[in-house]
């Protein structure tokens, strides 16, 4: 499949989805998109800018959710035009899907909603590439049912994304077998390195996170031969309005992406060991 002007999957080099969890302001969106676009261009990594206009699943009613669909889409359109990069954003059950699909290049469905059949069908009917996040409660092989629903719309541009599985209360673990298992869906496989280190509800009224484990999980996922890496970034994670504790510090990303590119090339240049 293709996102904008580049191929995804089938042994192609990994692509990056990255940006702040939520659009905090137009200036911040432009600054982060510009920096990430420059870094990925220098490294030769295909890049999709990610940020959300609405975080509908925040832990607390008092948490910052975003700037709303109208302002959010206006900013994403400006990012896309200014830096010539594709953009991805989350959609929810009450999102005006067609309006969003006119602006973004990829629609992303939240993990919590992966079993909502009507929601998945309506999103996929927009005809855009869709990144479907696997629920924290779902076995990797059960994503085949989700993919079958999605493709029943005639949309073949479907990706599946691992973002950790619930491990008791307020904790997630990443089962790297999941990445290999989900390849059986025939869809490109994406690893969400930052939400995988989230501690859901771990701060009482908000989620905690262990960003120090983002590098090790990202490298482990590269060893599996993933097609895409999802990694939320922020100029100052400790001041982020959403998911700061599991966000990657943006100004440290270039050196790390360079390492991941080397790992990706090494893994995909080797024959697969069959047992």
UniProtKB/Swiss-Prot annotation:
Keywords, comma-separated and alphabetical: Cytoplasm, Lipopolysaccharide biosynthesis, Transferase
Cross-referenced PANTHER family:
PHOSPHO-2-DEHYDRO-3-DEOXYHEPTONATE ALDOLASE (PTHR21057)
The region annotated as signal peptide is none
Gene Ontology biological process terms from the UniProt entry: keto-3-deoxy-D-manno-octulosonic acid biosynthetic process
Q: What is this protein called?
A: 2-dehydro-3-deoxyphosphooctonate aldolase
Q: Return the broad EC class.
A: transferase
Which cell locations does it reside in? Cytoplasm
Q: Part of which pathway?
A: Carbohydrate biosynthesis; 3-deoxy-D-manno-octulosonate biosynthesis; 3-deoxy-D-manno-octulosonate from D-ribulose 5-phosphate: step 2/3; Bacterial outer membrane biogenesis; lipopolysaccharide biosynthesis
Molecular function in Gene Ontology? 3-deoxy-8-phosphooctulonate synthase activity
A GO-annotated cellular component? cytoplasm
Q: Which gene encodes it?
A: kdsA
The family classification in the record reads: Belongs to the KdsA family.
Enzyme Commission number, as recorded: 2.5.1.55
| Gene3D superfamilies recorded | Aldolase class I
Q: To which species is this protein native?
A: Francisella tularensis subsp. mediasiatica (strain FSC147)
Q: Which SUPFAM superfamilies match?
A: Aldolase
Spell out the InterPro entries in the cross-references.
Aldolase_TIM, DAHP1/KDSA, KDO8P_synthase
